[in-house]
Amino acid sequence: MQIGILGWFGVPNAQSAVLAMLVPPLLLWALRKEKFWLLCVTAFLGFGLLYATGTRLTYFSAVLTAAGMLVLLLWNRKPLRFCLPLLLALVLLLGLKGFSPMEQRQMRSLDSNELYREKTEAVMGSDMGYAYRKGEEIPAEVKEKLERLYTEVYGVPGPYKLPLLGDMIEKFGLEAVMEAYGYTDAPEQLYNARLKKLKCLELNWQQKDFLTKMLGFEYAEATVNGNIYDPENDFPALLYYYGYLGAGLYLLFAAYFVFSALRALFRRGPGFVTLELGAAALMFCYALGAAQFSGQTLRKPNVCVYFSLAAAMLWQQSHPVVRNRPQVDRKSVVFLKKI
């Protein structure tokens, strides 16, 4: 429980995204039932699960959902008693942040960084923390230390016998890898698995021709010495796998729903801001946010199905169906009255 309840889902990032997107419509369902006890139960279960999951995405989405739904209730002048569970959840989430599984997970990451910070200090000495500026010449002594750091510390398998930068150095060369990382010696970057995946595909991308960059390259390009470096962040992955053309079309399609909602807001005014719109907007924003900052969202069918649902809800709210009443002529009305 100290590191959250991850594990029942195939991909932890995808699990967090699904939970974040499901809580707003769950609360909307309870609010539309207009039963206070039902709202209390759904708020407890929804926010409790987000808090206990132990990722930054679920924790911050819980805070934003509680605050967002609270504002929507006040905006739509709903009974104040429905605000109480959301207000209580918001206070508890903020007050118990220091005890959350998310904080415990972050502390463990800091412990790993501290281990490599000591190794970095042993190699870099007084030059630790060197800040490279693009275009400047690196002092020979500092560059020699950086080369030792990248090869002797990060060029060998890590604590879990997994490669750090060794396979990338073998494929792209030491100088290219050092340049990709900006000649940094920071453990927060060099020991960051998420960043490593992005750097690996970035180096691959730099070697491609114009046509490949327009259409993207295949998934096999993310494999180095049998290790898969498929990026966790979805937006860079869209660019690398589908090129400028595919990524541009995807973003334009997503932007259409945002444009539709903003246009409807401009035309219909404050009355357009309803609980239904708020729940859809939260789901939509969480999907985009998870794609950029967490990942495994846009490219997983079992996750992006909820993104599609949010987009459909946004479109439905922006394009209400107007039912035309049947026209009755004046003679028919007179005839009916006589009868």
Q: How does the language model describe each region?
A:
Residues 76-185, 206-207:
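A membrane-periplasm/extracellular boundary helix in multi-pass inner-membrane enzymes
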Residues 29-40, 71-82, 263-269, 314-339:
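Membrane-interface junctions at the ends of membrane-embedded or membrane-associated helices
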